Amino acid sequence: MSNNNFKDDFEKNRQSINPDEQQTELKEDDKTNENKKEADSQNSLSNNSNQQFPPRNAQRRKRRRETATNQSKQQDDKHQKNSDAKTTEGSLDDRYDEAQLQQQHDKSQQQNKTEKQSQDNRMKDGKDAAIVNGTSESPEHKSKSTQNRPGPKAQQQKRKSESTQSKPSTNKDKKAATGAGIAGAAGVAGAAETSKRHHNKKDKQDSKHSNHENDEKSVKNDDQKQSKKGKKAAVGAGAAAGVGAAGVAHHNNQNKHHNEEKNSNQNNQYNDQSEGKKKGGFMKILLPLIAAILILGAIAIFGGMALNNHNDSKSDDQKIANQSKKDSDKKDGAQSEDNKDKKSDSNKDKKSDSDKNADDDSDNSSSNPNATSTNNNDNVANNNSNYTNQNQQDNANQNSNNQQATQGQQSHTVYGQENLYRIAIQYYGEGTQANVDKIKRANGLSSNNIHNGQTLVIPQ
């Protein structure tokens, strides 16, 4: 049985659609052999990716293997091209002997010492070194250009420059045998490369302004390329001194401009940091002031509340004291009224006792009417005569008493619910029974009952 028995009619009749085949065939004629291989692999991948109906089973596995091998080949080719380019660029790098490398190493160490001693003069020293030693060799210029970077960045650059300078020169003998014609051609090439470097350097400086974080990487790449190209220019200067000197001068001017741009960027960063510190310092001053104002406001509010509560408590205490005083006055008044009522009740009791005694006397007198009637009849005449005499004497005595009483007595008119005890307190200061009896005798009263509007005589 074949595999087609397991497929439906649609899968049996399917066909791959390759719309890019004609265009790729036209382009293949103009490419080289290497480009043809790459184009074939890419076309196979694109054709496989553009198929409307992807293959299954064995065909799919085959396509996966092809794509994997093509991708690995492409990566190997790219890596080989990059390595070839690096070897071609570095073919003219190492033209210095070991004595020159040692001198350069010593100079870089001295420059590191001076950099640690004076950080403020670092910028000026970098500019002066770029002007004076403009025609010197590129490794020296490379070590001086790194002086303009303060802090650990400059040290890292110098360490890398020392490591690049310490590489052994492998092709020194072969390069020393080259003639004057080759040197002249190299000089012309060095001048051309300095001009090319000028344009590349401007583009890199623009990218540095747009992105400060990639500044270190771009600076490292610039320094490496400058060192390589400076070495090429120095080789060409042996045959074409004029062209080489012009290229070196142009290179020094570009390095100077590059250092000034870096210094301006660093100054801008320092200014930004100082402005950030000023803003932070202002906020540090402002926040404690706001906190102190809030605390003082809270203290003032709580103090006012405490004073109000204190005043309220004082007023409440005063009200309570006044109320207690009024209550005590009411109690005293009630007690005095009770005492007066008790005294009046006792007087009433005494009066009732006296009335009882009078009744008893009247009873006793009525028990012997017959005995007394005879005596009365006998003494009627005597009594009449005595009565007349007594009336005369009583009138005389009463007149004399009235005259004496009117001379040192006062009168009082009864109003409201007054009684003899209150009147005695008003005139004598004490409501005793003796004072009440004095008023009763002066007014001829037999009881304590008095009525409203009655005029009483108050004796002295």
From Swiss-Prot:
SMART domains noted in UniProt: LysM (SM00257)
Domain of life the protein comes from: Bacteria
Subcellular location: Cell membrane
Compositional bias annotation for Low complexity: 41-57, 177-192, 264-273, 364-411
Residue ranges, annotated region (Disordered): 1-277, 313-411
Biased composition (Basic and acidic residues): 1-14, 24-40, 74-128, 203-226, 313-359
GO cellular component: plasma membrane
Signal peptide: none
Transmembrane segments: 285-305
InterPro entries: LysM_dom, LysM_dom_sf
Name of this protein: Probable elastin-binding protein EbpS
Gene: ebpS
